[in-house]
């Protein structure tokens, strides 16, 4: 595949730190030429087999009878007071024409079994509320509904009515449900054991789309949460109106229920009537048929493992594992992202899955070029950055001298490696952080998210490349039509992120709010990945400007880290020092101590030309007033400080003559023996091997 020109320009324009000549070569000729092994916080390679037992069946499996049972309220033994429920039946009026239509649950799945359920809820109110409170609650409900029926708006803040404090947790739960069942147009909220009743504004909103009878029944259905039950709205021949109902339900309750349209034949007219049916979403553990041992009440199960993947994008690997285990991608946690075209080993933790269940899918995932091992129970998830670094074993093939270089190739290679080993390399974020798309890079999506341009971010995400393949044909169709449902039918199953966004857009619509919900279909780590891509791009440009402007000298206004032992990006502000004029003149600090801020709300800028450069860039990108928080997507970007130079550790290398290279492929005459370079080294967390190699070779890799 032809390389992306913009991709090359971005990194070719960044300056180097060392002055050696370098050489040409090819990396990642195959995934086995680029092996990445994560180093955990204890300094251990994660591909080493752990000696401790993988898991103990006896500690994980529980018999169903051993589960603690929730205490249930004995509704049958509650005292009943007849006559207090009569007002409820006057609150809802039906027209004669609606009597034959059964909106709400299907007969076999009806929420209200005769009158028993309604009476039971009313009895709970009568039993727990004194007569005065019960009467005041009924009056409050009548007042709210009368105002809505008379089209009178509720002035100011919505009114509320306090039931009072209910200390018993079970009684509070029963009262919450009883009030919502009796008065679906009200909602209840808890405040320190107090139950407060308010108007249900979503009920009123739904009444603008459907009859009040349907709204009343729908909210009763929703509150009852009866497993395997369905709710059906009245037949509707207006497609746009049905679409509005779909979007309302999915926008407000999409995490709980799903909607579908079904055709029903109208016998009198001979035309099909279409109904919108709602049903509760299947729980993840039921989709994956997870055993009872994974649903221990009050205890979240975490299973750690080492993931080996080959030539596979990390997010694609997580999506595949999630499907096989019946969980969602956000249930996986990891310490860092890994390359696609490589063989990588990394630590991961998945929640709500036992070690035994993970071990059961080993054979299935091998077909996807993945393996899992070192499977064991742990107490918590991983967080980004929770690693010491990565070990790399790399083969660089097709070694050649730079153009017009007459020196010996072997000498050039040794000179370059020793130079970087001694002086270090510029600690740029690697190109894999930004994607290799010709038209759109991940940092452009991140900038749109920072500017709260959600729809633009979606369109950038789904912008096709100039390639004729199923993925890009699907993306092209979406940009032309904004038809999420049609695009889903075209998008290949393995494109997990694209399909997640499209499914959400189908549910919520291609609106600003729908696009926000679509971004929420991706795990938090994926959402913030795009924002980090933008802040990483700016940091790369900043460090290049810093070195071009001041070189290796530490000058007034630079920021330096005072703690030599910190080897990650989590420098506290207390460890960051602003270099004074006197300190700069006295050469008190070395260049390897200089740090630059990665954009965020909790950083300080250098007090020299570099600081002004940051402000100019923010102005250029329309972020002068950006607070680096995107509350609509629950993204907070505090920022951090990153050292401008890094050194490879435990570096070793070997030149290897490879007589087979090119001979088999071209059969041409070889004037000199082809060389390959085997190089191994360790890098700190958030450092990139491709960046280190670029400094060594002085050539794009």
From Swiss-Prot:
Cellular component annotations (GO), alphabetically ordered: nucleus
UniProt cross-references to NCBIfam families, sorted A to Z: tRNA_TruD_broad (TIGR00094)
Any Pfam family the entry gives: PUS7L_N
TM stretches of this protein: none
Domain of life where this protein originates: Eukaryota
GO molecular function: pseudouridine synthase activity; RNA binding
Keywords: Isomerase, mRNA processing, Phosphoprotein
PANTHER family given in the database record: PSEUDOURIDYLATE SYNTHASE PUS7L, TRNA PSEUDOURIDINE SYNTHASE D
Task performed by this protein: Pseudouridine synthase that catalyzes pseudouridylation of mRNAs.
Organism encoding this protein: Homo sapiens
InterPro entries registered for this protein in UniProt: PsdUridine_synth_cat_dom_sf, PsdUridine_synth_TruD, PsdUridine_synth_TruD_insert, PUS7L_N, R3H_PUS7L, TruD_catalytic
Family: Belongs to the pseudouridine synthase TruD family.
Documented EC number(s): 5.4.99.-
GO biological process terms on file: mRNA processing; mRNA pseudouridine synthesis; pseudouridine synthesis
Phosphoserine sites (modified residues): 79
Active site feature: 339 (nucleophile)
Enzymatic reactions: a uridine in mRNA = a pseudouridine in mRNA
Alphabetical list of SUPFAM superfamilies matching this protein: Pseudouridine synthase
Domain TRUD: start-end pairs: 424-647
Protein name: Pseudouridylate synthase PUS7L
């Amino acid at each position: 595949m032809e390389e992306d020109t913009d991709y090359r320009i971005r990194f070719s324009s960044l300056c180097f730190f060392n002055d050696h000549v370098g050489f040409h070569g090819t990396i990642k000729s195959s995934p086995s030429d680029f092996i990445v092994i994560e180093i955990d916080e204890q300094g251990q390679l994660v591909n080493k087999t752990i000696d401790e037992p993988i898991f103990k069946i006896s500690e994980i499996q529980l018999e169903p009878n051993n589960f603690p049972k929730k205490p249930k309220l004995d509704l049958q033994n509650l005292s009943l007071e007849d006559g207090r429920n009569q007002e409820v039946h006057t609150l809802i009026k039906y027209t004669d024409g609606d009597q034959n239509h059964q909106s709400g649950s299907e007969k076999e799945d009806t929420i209200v079994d005769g009158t028993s359920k309604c009476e039971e809820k009313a009895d709970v109110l009568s039993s727990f509320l004194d007569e005065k409170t019960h009467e005041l609650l009924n009056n409050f409900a009548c007042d709210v509904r009368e105002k809505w029926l008379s089209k009178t708006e509720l002035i100011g803040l919505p009114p509320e009515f306090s039931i009072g404090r209910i200390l018993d947790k079970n009684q509070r739960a029963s009262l919450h449900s009883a009030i919502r069942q009796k008065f679906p147009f009200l909602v209840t909220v808890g405040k320190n054991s107090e139950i407060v009743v308010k108007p249900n504004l979503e009920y009123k909103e739904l009444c603008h789309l459907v009859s009040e009878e349907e709204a009343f029944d729908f909210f009763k259905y929703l509150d009852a949460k009866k497993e395997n039950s369905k709710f059906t709205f009245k037949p509707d021949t207006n497609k746009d109106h049905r679409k509005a109902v779909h979007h309302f339900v999915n926008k407000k309750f999409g995490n709980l229920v799903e909607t579908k349209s079904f055709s029903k034949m109208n016998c009198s007219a001979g035309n099909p009537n279409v109904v919108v049916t709602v049903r509760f979403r299947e729980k993840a553990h039921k989709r994956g048929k997870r055993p009872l041992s994974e649903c221990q009440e009050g205890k979240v199960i975490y299973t750690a493992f080492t993931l080996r993947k080959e030539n596979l994008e990390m997010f694609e690997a997580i999506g595949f594992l999630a499907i096989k285990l019946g969980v969602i991608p956000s249930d996986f946690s990891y310490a860092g992202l890994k390359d696609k075209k490589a063989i990588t080993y990394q630590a991961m933790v998945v929640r709500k899955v036992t070690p035994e269940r993970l071990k059961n899918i080993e054979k299935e995932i091998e077909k996807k070029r993945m393996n899992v091992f070192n499977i064991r129970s742990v107490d918590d998830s991983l967080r980004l950055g929770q690693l010491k670094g990565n070990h790399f074993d790399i083969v660089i093939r097709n070694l050649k001298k730079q153009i017009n270089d007459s020196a010996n190739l072997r000498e050039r290679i040794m000179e370059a490696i020793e130079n970087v080993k001694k002086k270090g390399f510029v600690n740029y974020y690697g190109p894999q952080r930004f994607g290799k798309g010709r038209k759109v890079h991940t940092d452009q999506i991140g900038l749109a998210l920072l500017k709260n341009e959600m729809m633009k971010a979606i369109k950038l995400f789904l912008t096709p490349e100039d390639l004729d393949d199923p993925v890009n044909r699907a993306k092209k169709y979406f940009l032309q039509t904004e038809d999420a449902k049609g695009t889903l039918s075209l998008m290949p199953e393995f494109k997990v992120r694209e399909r997640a966004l499209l499914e959400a857009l189908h549910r919520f619509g291609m609106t600003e709010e729908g696009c926000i919900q679509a971004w929420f279909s991706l795990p938090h780590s994926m959402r913030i990945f795009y924002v980090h891509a933008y802040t990483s791009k700016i940091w790369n440009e900043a460090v290049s400007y810093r070195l071009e402007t001041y070189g290796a000298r530490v000058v007034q206004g630079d920021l330096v880290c005072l703690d030599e032992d910190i080897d990650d990006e989590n420098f506290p502000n207390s460890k960051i020092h602003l270099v004074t004029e006197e300190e700069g003149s006295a050469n008190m600090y070395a260049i390897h101590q200089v740090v630059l801020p990665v954009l965020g709300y909790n950083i300080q800028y250098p007090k020299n030309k570099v600081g002004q450069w940051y402000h100019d860039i923010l102005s250029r990108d329309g972020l002068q007033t950006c607070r680096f928080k995107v509350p609509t997507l629950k993204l907070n970007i505090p920022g951090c400080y990153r050292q401008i130079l890094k050194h490879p550790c435990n570096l070793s290398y070997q030149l290897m003559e490879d007589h087979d290279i090119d001979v088999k492929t071209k059969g041409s005459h070889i004037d000199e023996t082809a060389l390959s370079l085997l190089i191994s080294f360790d890098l700190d967390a958030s450092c990139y091997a491709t960046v280190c190699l670029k400094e060594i070779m002085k050539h794009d890799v």
